[in-house]
């Protein structure tokens, strides 16, 4: 067999029955239609235990790309942290106890949601209880979600935090993730969340629930809740400690570096002394903070096997998904392997991606076409549209997003045939195939379900249903490379 291989990941395009709110089935997509008619295809599971998440938990881009790149199921931080809370080992964690001994008040920040993509409410509340049992006053800095869960669900999670309120546990600030969890160096957003958390800017006399209700009445949903300080909160004190409870790294880096970093260049923090800081996981290799759940080494990965075989590879994506085809795809390793090239295409600078549903797909495709013409042995490319436009809740824009991806797929498949590439086309998780629920309410979160996988390769006439963990072994089989014992079985 031994073919050069192109792996295409169409982010956020999954499988659900046809409906008016399924952007995938509603789109005009001649390339996909042709693949359904003539290419071997099967469904792959992208959620729950099949990708190392709790049963029934929706998949996400980080987990999906890690699973694809590792070629096996990796139990995710979400599962590990939940187990540590359940069995009591987190309370005895030496890093946590050491941090506790050095700090007075504890500022505990995180995404207040059970979406399980960046955080989980049970982790945030579990840590609050642990620190209060250790005698600390705990000040909660709640980041409202509205993206991985319903856009008006924050009251439910705030109620859970309020149920814990005591002499030691209080809600200090609220901020929408649009401000507190940017990942694209939009420092004006981070600065607003920083000001509220670090200094108690934008005070309100409203209770947490009253404040959320006032924001809703102003037409502002959870993702975009304006940062506010509550209950007379006035900011950090020199003896305080700051804990960030999100486990996913990409949207934690900016806010944690702003609040905890000794040196910081995103904006002028004025006369600022950062507090002692504790991170849930490893957000960035350059961060000096202690970590509750350090990164486990994931090897071998697909990229590693290809590199060690002396072959060349190219990883392509636009900004929104660049970390996914590099850092996450390579098992949490930032540095490229030998003979691994990378192309980053800037994502369009728009407030929300429904304003430009094609995003940077044409440029991503151009870079991939160039890679095939240069003869890279393996290319992985991500199209972000289905996910990023799906998150806006705009069905018409999501349909346009699918059509944009379909156009670029047509160009890539034509060049792949010309240049002798095998093609594996799949997704990391679903999103745009379910834009509204059965009641007609907008859905902005990922779906719980399967995605399609198509394979165009010499001698492949049929593939099995399976999981994302089987993609890497399938690539290696097509490329004529041995599959490491740590990886799972291929799809044919």
Curated annotation (Swiss-Prot):
GO terms for molecular function: manganese ion binding; phosphoglycerate mutase activity. GO terms for cellular component: cytosol. The gene is gpmI. The keyword Cell membrane does not apply. One of its GO terms (biological process) is glucose catabolic process. The lineage of its organism: Bacteria, Pseudomonadati, Campylobacterota, Epsilonproteobacteria, Campylobacterales. It holds the Pfam family iPGM_N. The active site is at 61 (phosphoserine intermediate). Keywords: Glycolysis, Isomerase, Manganese, Metal-binding. Mn(2+) 2 binds at residues 11, 61, 428-429. Substrate binds at residues 118, 147-148, 177, 183, 248-251, 321. It is an enzyme of class 5 (isomerase). Its EC number is 5.4.2.12. It comes from Wolinella succinogenes (strain ATCC 29543 / DSM 1740 / CCUG 13145 / JCM 31913 / LMG 7466 / NCTC 11488 / FDC 602W) (Vibrio succinogenes). Catalyzes the interconversion of 2-phosphoglycerate and 3-phosphoglycerate. SUPFAM superfamilies: 2,3-Bisphosphoglycerate-independent phosphoglycerate mutase, substrate-binding domain, Alkaline phosphatase-like. Binds 2 manganese ions per subunit. Mn(2+) 1 binds at residues 387, 391, 446. It catalyses: (2R)-2-phosphoglycerate = (2R)-3-phosphoglycerate. Monomer. Belongs to the BPG-independent phosphoglycerate mutase family. This is 2,3-bisphosphoglycerate-independent phosphoglycerate mutase. InterPro entries: Alkaline_phosphatase_core_sf, BPG-indep_PGM_N, Metalloenzyme, PGAM_B_sf, Pgm_bpd_ind.
